[in-house]
Amino acid sequence: MIIDKYKKLLMEHMNNIFHFTKIQSGGYTLYKTNCIIDKSHSMYYNSSDGTFTCPICGFSKDIVSLCSAIRNVDEWVMLEKILKIKLKMDTRPVLVDARKEMFKNELLYQINYDAMLFFEEQLQESPIAIKYLTGRGLTKETIQRFHLGYAPKYNKLHRTLKDNFAEEDLETAGVIGIDKKTGRYYDVFKDRIIFPIIDKNEQILGFGGRTLGSSTKKYINTKTTAIFQKSQCLYALNMVNLSHRPKRILVCEGYMDVIALHQQGIDWAVGTLGTALTQSHYKQLLKFTDNPTIVFDGDDAGINATNRALQKIGKLDVLLLPENKDPDEYIKTYGKQNFLQYIQNNIQTYEEYWLKQYTGKGNIFEYFLNQSKIKKIMY
C-alpha cells in the first residue's frame, strides 16, 4: 500500500517525535517512552518494525495506526498531521497519494457491491441453492438481511461486470482470477453459496463461499486485497447493535453458526471466517465489548481450538457447547431461551477454563507444575 512508504519514512524520524529511553532486550534494542494513552512511561518502540507496544493499554501498532485509532480519524489524515506538525514537511505529495489510494479503495468497494447484487440475483434463479439455505433452517427474511447469494457454475460474473469495470480491477478486487497458462479470466467463486463480508460502515470487504458441488475446498474467501485481510475481518460485525456496548460478543467459527444465532435473536454474535482468532480480531472486539467470548464444540477438536486461542490471545471468556453440537445445531435443537440459560450456567473465564482443564481431569499436580506457563498466558 502507498501509505506504507510514508510509515517507513516516519520510522527514520522517531527521535524527532518522541523522547526515548534506550534499553536492551533479548539481544536487540528497544526504546521506551511515555504512553500516548495513559501518559505513564510504559510504551515500548521496536525500531526494527516500527511497532509501539504498551502492556498496560494492550495495543501494538505503528504510530499512524495507533494515533488514528485514538483520534478516530482516517490513517491518511493522521499521517498528514504528523508529517506536517511534527516534521514540518510539505505534505502536498502525501495528499495526492492519499486521493489515489482512497479512489482505488472506493473502486474495490463498488466492485464488491455490484458483485453482491449479482450473487443475490443469481440466488433467486437457483432452486438448488435456495433449497440448501431453507434446508438449513434459514427464513427468507434472514437470507435477505445477510445478503446471501449464489455464484453460478460458469463465468457469468466476469461477463456481467466487465462491461462496467476493467478486468484488471476485477482481478485486483478478487472476484475474478487469471489463468497463468492461458491468460484467460475466470470467476473465483463457482457453484457456491455466497456470504458477503461487510464492515460496520456497511462497506463490502469481500466474500466467503461454501461449495454446493464437488470442490475439495468446502469454503473459500476473497484473496487478500487493499480492503480485505481475512485475519482482520469479523463476519456479521455490521449486524451487531454497537450503538450501546454489548455486555458480551460471542465469537463463532462458521458463517452458519452466526446466522443461526442472529435469526433466533442472539444478535451479539460474530464469526472469524473460518480462521483462528487473531490479536487483530481481539483488539477489534475490545472496542465494542468487555467480554469477547469464544464459542466452540465441547469435543476434542473444540477444546484444542480453545486452547490455541487462549495461548495466543489470553484473556478471553470461553463457552464450550455439548460434544458434537455447534451453535447452529444447539439453538435449532433447544431454542433461544435454553441457549441463553446454557450461556449463563456454563460461561468460563480464562482462569476458570485453565484450572478446570487440569484439575477437572485429576491432574492437580500438573496444574501446579504448569503455573508459570499459565501465568505467562494469562498475564
Show which residues each predicted segment covers.
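Conserved active-site segments centered on acidic
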Residues: 76-128
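Short linear loop/turn motifs
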Residues: 26-33, 79-87, 92-101, 143-156, ...
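TOPRIM fold recognition
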Residues: 1-8, 55-58, 204-206, 213-226, ...
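N-terminal structured subdomain of primase-like DNA metabolism proteins
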Residues: 1-96, 337, 341, 345
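Short, well-structured beta-strand/strand-turn elements
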Residues: 22-23, 136-150, 265-275
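Active-site-proximal helix/loop microenvironment
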Residues: 108, 115, 150-153, 377-378
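Phosphate-handling DNA/RNA-contact segment within nucleic-acid enzymes
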Residues: 10, 14, 48, 101-103, ...
